[in-house]
Amino acid sequence: MACCRCFTDGSTISTGGEDGKLKLWSVDSGFCFVTFSEHTSSITGVAYAPNGKVVLSSSLDGTVRAFDTTRYRNFRTFTSPRPVQFGCISIDASGELIAAGGIDVYEVFLWYVFVLISP
């Protein structure tokens, strides 16, 4: 495991692995209930949108991915204009702005994503 994050209500923990897999775990049962395998390199950061319907992950593969926690699918992939390895990720309190830090270029990349806060 390379990183983890607990959802604010304490019901779910998400983990990012060096194998590129993002897993969601039930705190009550202790079981993994979904595994996303879209990343091709180590996951370096995990963040939840404030509404809890989206979990985001950053990776050394140069992508930031948004996963739907209801339908269990990768519905959006963010990349930079040039290849970069992402080392961390964060989302603001409104759920509209995603920030990811590049570890090889020492830059912060921002995406404005109004669609992530839709009900």
Task: Pin down the residues of each PLM region.
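WD40-repeat beta-propellers
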Residues: L22-W25, V64-D68, E107-V113
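Short coil turn/linker residues within repeat-based beta-strand modules
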Residues: S29-F31, R71-R73, V105, V115-I117
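Short C-terminal beta-strands that terminate individual repeats in beta-propeller domains
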Residues: C32-E38, N74-P81, P119
